[in-house]
């Protein structure tokens, strides 16, 4: 299946540049593009990627891997590929920081299906760094609080039946949109959290005084 290049509306007027593919041989080129965009002309507190996973119908394996930097998203349908992409394995283990919402089950599935684990210090579970009322705040609640109120129904508006179709090729447009938004939200949540932390670094360094205002 040839790669698809699409525009996906994330929220408001924010549009994502999305590449969707199940061809392993095409992934290295897109990864290099993402890495260049990650590495060059980027503030230190923005050097990371958003990561998200979608699972097979039996929930036992990874069907789709999504990576996001800024408004650039790669959707790789692992379940319909030849499952041989050493460049992806190297990329995930290269020391780049990845932000994801709730990786507890994903870590096991990545280990069993890929035979690889992202280094512990390079994988940030956003549910452990940002909390609202509950210990593990949902992606939708975080997105409403930090990005846009439009994300309030980002999970409930996606038909449950579509969750069983992540192995279908090509993916339905609604699945592509859902996958792209998930990856973008993972990236954008962590970006906003890091911007705030970066802006408050002086409070930890020297404390706060009226002269700062």
Predicted regions and their residues:
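A short alpha/beta connector and helix-capping loop motif
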Residues: 57-73
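Acidic beta-strand-to-loop metal/phosphate-binding motif
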Residues: 97-103
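A short alpha->loop->secondary-structure connector
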Residues: 113-123
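Acidic, Mg2+-coordinating catalytic module of metal-dependent nucleases/exonucleases
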Residues: 144-211
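Nucleic-acid-processing active sites and adjacent nucleic-acid-binding tracks
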Residues: 72-92, 96
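Short alpha-helix plus adjacent loop in nuclease-associated cores
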Residues: 124-148
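N-terminal accessory regions of nucleic-acid-interacting proteins
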Residues: 1-49, 81, 126, 184, ...
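Short acidic, Gly/Ser-rich segments with clustered Asp/Glu that frequently serve as metal-coordination loops
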Residues: 48-60
């Amino acid at each position: 299946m040839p790669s698809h290049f699409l525009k996906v509306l994330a929220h408001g007027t924010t549009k994502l540049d999305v590449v969707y593919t199940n061809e392993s041989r095409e992934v290295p080129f897109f990864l290099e593009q993402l890495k260049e965009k990650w590495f060059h002309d980027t503030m230190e507190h923005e050097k990371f990627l958003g990561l998200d996973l979608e699972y097979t119908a039996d929930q036992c394996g990874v069907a789709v891997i999504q990576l996001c930097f800024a408004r650039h998203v790669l959707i790789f349908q692992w379940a319909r590929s030849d499952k041989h992409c050493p460049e992806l394995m190297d990329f995930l283990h290269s020391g780049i920081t990845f932000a994801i919402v709730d990786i507890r089950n994903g870590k096991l599935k990545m280990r069993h299906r890929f035979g690889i684990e992202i280094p512990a210090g390079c994988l940030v579970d956003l549910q452990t760094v940002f909390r609202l009322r509950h210990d593990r705040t949902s992606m939708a609640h975080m997105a409403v609080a930090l990005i846009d109120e439009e994300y309030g129904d980002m999970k409930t508006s996606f038909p449950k039946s579509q969750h069983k179709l992540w192995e279908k090729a090509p993916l339905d447009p609604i699945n592509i949109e859902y996958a792209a938004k998930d990856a973008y939200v993972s990236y954008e949540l962590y970006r906003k959290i890091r911007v705030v932390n970066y802006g408050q670094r002086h409070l930890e360094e020297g404390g706060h005084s009226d002269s700062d205002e």
